[in-house]
Every structure is written in C-alpha cells, then in structure tokens.
Amino acid sequence: SILVMGAIDTDTLYDRLMNTFEWGRMNEEDVHLDYYTIRTMSVIRFRSLYTRLAMELLKEGKRERAIDVLNRCMELAPSRVLPFDQYVTGITLPTKDGGIIHHEGIIEAYYLCGETGKANQILSEHYQNLSQEILYYNAMKPGHRSSIQREINEAMFQLEELRILLENFQQEELMLELGISDFDS
C-alpha cells in the first residue's frame, strides 16, 4: 500500500538531506518555481521526507537533530516557495480493515519536538491561507464550484486536520484567535 511507508536509516537520510542533496537556490527571493517544479516537489513528497526523518530522530531521542531537520525543511521550502499542503497538516486515513493510518505533518512534528511557537506560526499561516481559499471558492457560481470540488474538499479536510492539531496539542488560545471556538465539533 502507498500509505504504509518502509523503515529509514536515520544516519544515512540525515546526512543526505542535511549535507549531500543540493536544492539550488529555490528558497531565495529572486527565484520563482514554475508549476512543474512545484508539482515535482509534491510528487517526491519533499516535506514528508524531512518530517519522517524528524519523527524517527525523535523516536531515537535525538530531539535537537529532529528540530534541525524541520528547520532545514522550512528554510528550503517556506510557503512562498512551496505552497503548504497535506504534508504540513498531516494525513489521517481509514484503512481497508477498519483501522486508521496516520502520517504526521511538519506542524505536528514541531509540536512533538516542543517547538510550539514554530508549530503555531505555520499552523496559523496555513489556516489563514485555507480560509481565504474557501472564501474564494464560495464566491464562485455553483456551476464553477462543482468543477473544483476536489480542491474544496482538500481545503476542508486540511482545515479539519488543523482543528484536530489545535485540540490535540491544547492550543485553546490560538483556536480562539483563529475563530475556532468549538472544541467538541
């Protein structure tokens, strides 16, 4: 299944992501990534690579290295370079046998590393972007909205994942600030 990911060698992957791989100047202000490059970054699951490594390092008790990996990911691919997606929020899906599979996103990884401020900053930015996206979709004529139902569903799914993160990590103040006041919804 594409949902079940194999084991990783943290030392090798850390060395490759932090020292070997070169991503060019993609994070610099004067560089624009075209649609195909952004799509490729999504296909290779750029943020997921870093997040998975950080989560494994955290399991090994290497918190500082995990934080370094997350910071490197966000340094290379801030939202202005690579728009936030499900690899920021995390993914929780049902399995065929009635179970659940969960892949942490970078926000959850930051929370688990104790970097609440960074997690909240990314979450807040992503929430605001998704909210604007939903407003844009809702302003469309119904006929047009039906042609982008997948995008609407994805945005709504990610908003719900963000709400769950806020609730799970007891970020009541940020929930209120963002206008999410119902913890039991």
List each language-model region with its residue ranges.
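C-terminal luminal/periplasmic domains and tails of membrane-associated envelope-modifying transferases
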Residues: 1-185
